[in-house]
Design a protein with these regions (language model features):
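N-terminal active-site segment of His-dependent metallophosphoesterases
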Residues: 33-104, 386-391
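Short acidic, glycine-rich surface-loop motifs adjacent to enzyme active sites
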Residues: 92, 189-209
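Bacterial N-terminal signal peptides
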Residues: 24-30
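Bacterial N-terminal signal peptides that target proteins for export
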Residues: 8-23
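Active-site glycine-centered loops adjacent to acidic/histidine catalytic or metal-binding residues
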Residues: 52, 93-94, 122-123, 203, ...
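Binuclear metal-dependent phosphoesterase catalytic core
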Residues: 249-333, 371, 376-405
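Extended active-site neighborhood of metal-dependent phosphoesterases/phosphodiesterases
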Residues: 100-194, 213-233, 237-281, 285
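Aromatic sugar-binding surface patches on proteins
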Residues: 348-381
Length: 406
């Protein structure tokens, strides 16, 4: 699908983009190893992915500036203290909630952390007025963040920000990419080495996790990238998931940083407020969901007997940032008891908040309850003796272990 009204702008900037990308690649190839740890040389980066900031009101904007961004800043400072590897921030779209006048202020707030800030455009980042063509609807975003489709290199990965929201004059939208974007992607792929990892960053998901398939509009992207390792980084869904379709094709759906649309401090799938951290070390990726205000090693949330509705006789644990490569085991009084039982359930903390603490108009309360759904990143165990000592150990796909004791 061609949008001829944008072709002139696209062509004028093509040469500049290509030059910037080639300079970035040259810098990558010439980069001297950085010293890290006890004399060990490592190369890489830290990318803090922020899902759908989406402030709609001035109060939400202040909360983003005064509560959430300072906690992200603490993560930036921890990375700086660990090494001199570069750190950047990526916003997965819906930078605002139809309040495009907030865009410059949100960008400035994130830039105050002193690291590069990249973004993709979301459906709520358009100036939503009826009978407004897509180019005009995108103008506030483009004036703030630059072109919708950009490329930048970090470590041994090339990142491509893609606009996959096609906006209609009647204020509706659908998900897709146009043929010019695919041409642009093909040009980028001809310029980068075959062994360079590719990360395509878009707002709406590229896969259907429940079917284990790539959405039809994203299939040409997969074909163009070819045999390279490809990661999609997306938002929009307001929940966390990692879809591993093959060893070289993974999607990371990043949960909303503010919880459930600012109305709950937890996303409806049980993911606490937080960011998604991608760390590249010597060409290899590792990642985790980082809860705001918590340490990087805090990944387990535990409910004792009687605290989780529907599982009152069990100890229940939630794995934050779970995917299907996790292993969760337990021991009782020092005796290994094997794998914990995986269960699907609504998040106990989310439901407690909705039923006991949330106080909004009925329309919002109904939305909070309706959005809650059962997820499978929960595990449970039942003691064989009362007051026994329990140890829960969870191991992620990278071999990192996380332990809690009761």
């Amino acid at each position: 699908m061609l949008f001829f009204d944008k072709c002139v702008t696209f062509a004028k900037n093509c040469v500049m983009r290509k030059t910037r990308l080639l300079l970035s690649l040259l810098a990558l190839l010439c980069l001297a190893p950085r010293v890290w740890g006890q004399g060990a040389a490592e190369e890489g980066f830290n990318l803090i992915v922020v899902g759908d900031p989406q402030p709609q009101t001035k109060a939400q904007l202040r909360s983003l500036e005064q509560e959430i961004i300072p906690q992200i800043g603490a993560i930036v400072e921890q990375y700086r203290a660990q090494s001199d590897l570069p750190t950047a921030i990526l916003l997965t779209g819906d930078v605002v909630w139809d309040t495009t006048k907030f865009l410059p202020r949100v960008k400035s707030a994130f830039e105050s952390l002193g690291v590069p800030v990249y973004a993709v455009i979301g459906n709520h980042d358009h100036a939503r007025k009826r009978n407004r063509p897509e180019e005009r609807a995108e103008r506030p975003y483009v004036e703030t963040f630059g072109e919708r489709n950009q490329a930048f290199v970090m470590g041994k990965t090339i990142f491509l920000t893609f606009d996959n929201i096609i906006y209609n004059p009647d204020k509706t939208y659908y998900e897709g990419v146009d043929s010019r974007q695919l041409v642009w992607l093909s040009e980028r792929m001809r310029e980068v080495p075959e062994d360079m990892r590719v990360a395509v960053c878009m707002h709406a998901p590229a896969t259907r996790l429940w079917r284990g398939e790539v959405r039809s509009y994203a299939l040409p992207i997969v074909d163009i990238v070819g045999d390279r390792e490809l990661h999609f980084i997306t938002g929009h869904a307001h929940r966390h998931f990692t879809a591993t379709l093959s060893p070289t094709l993974i999607e990371h759906s990043v949960a909303q940083v503010s919880g459930n649309l600012w109305f709950a401090p937890i996303c409806s799938d049980g993911t606490p407020r937080g960011v998604f951290c991608i760390e590249e070390r010597n060409g290899q990726w590792r990642w985790h969901h980082r809860m705001l205000g918590k340490g990087a090693d805090e990944r387990l949330v535990v409910w004792r007997e009687g605290e989780a509705y529907g599982c009152e006789d069990f100890v229940v644990v939630k794995v934050v940032g779970w995917d299907d490569r996790w292993r969760v085991e337990w021991s009782e009084n020092g005796v290994a008891m094997g794998a914990m039982e995986q269960v699907e359930m609504k998040d106990p903390d989310y439901m407690y908040y909705v039923d006991n603490e949330a106080n909004y108009r009925k329309i919002f309360m109904d939305r909070l309850r309706r959005s809650a759904s059962k997820r499978n990143h929960y595990y449970r165990l039942q003691r064989t003796s009362e007051n026994s000592e329990i140890t829960i150990t969870a191991t992620d796909r990278f071999g990192r272990t996380y332990t809690v004791q009761l």
